[in-house]
């Protein structure tokens, strides 16, 4: 595996590069083209990936602890089991990214708040935005579903697709669905079975 620790790769064209297990700790990858790059299990701790193109990149099990991903394009990237702890994802494009089992503890989300703040304040506010209580949404079995038939957003807004949600809230609904489908949003209240 390549050792590129602290390397200056700003604006580098690494499209489709095979960087599996590479050491890119503290590397400067600002505005780098990493479209479709294979970064499986790469060490990108504290790397600067601001405005990098990571569309369709394979970042499974990558270490992105404390990485700067501000304004990075992670559309359709595979971030399964990635360590994003304390990473900065403000203004990043996470559309269709796979975040299954990713560690977002202390991470800043693309909307500017820390993941913990998102869970504590944004999730309850979004769930209750249309007038239902969190308890009503949970009681409807919304945390048992990962489709638009009765997922939390379907229950909260009485809709079956994102486009039917209030326009002002669609970006937040999209964000919630991505994080929920990745299993990263726990049920906000204990159910009777857990209880």
Predicted region positions:
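Intrinsic low-complexity/IDR segments
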Residues: 1-5, 21, 25, 35, ...
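Extreme N-terminal basic, low-complexity initiation segments
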Residues: 2-12, 17
């Amino acid at each position: 595996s390549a050792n590129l620790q602290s390397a200056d790769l700003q604006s580098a064209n690494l499209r489709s590069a095979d960087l599996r297990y590479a050491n890119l700790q503290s590397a400067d990858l600002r505005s780098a083209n990493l479209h479709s790059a294979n970064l499986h299990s790469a060490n990108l701790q504290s790397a600067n990936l601001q405005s990098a193109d990571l569309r369709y990149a394979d970042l499974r099990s990558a270490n992105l602890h404390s990485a700067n991903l501000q304004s990075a394009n992670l559309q359709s990237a595979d971030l399964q089991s990635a360590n994003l702890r304390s990473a900065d994802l403000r203004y990043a494009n996470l559309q269709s990214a796979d975040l299954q089992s990713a560690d977002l503890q202390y991470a800043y989300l693309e909307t500017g708040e820390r993941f913990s703040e998102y869970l504590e304040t944004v999730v309850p506010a979004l769930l209750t935005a249309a007038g239902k209580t969190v308890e009503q949404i949970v009681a409807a079995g919304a945390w048992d579903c990962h489709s638009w038939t009765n997922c939390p957003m379907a229950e909260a807004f009485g809709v079956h697709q994102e486009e039917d949600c209030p326009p002002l809230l669609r970006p937040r609904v999209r964000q919630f669905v991505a994080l929920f489908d990745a299993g990263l949003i726990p049920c906000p209240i204990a159910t009777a079975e857990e209880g």
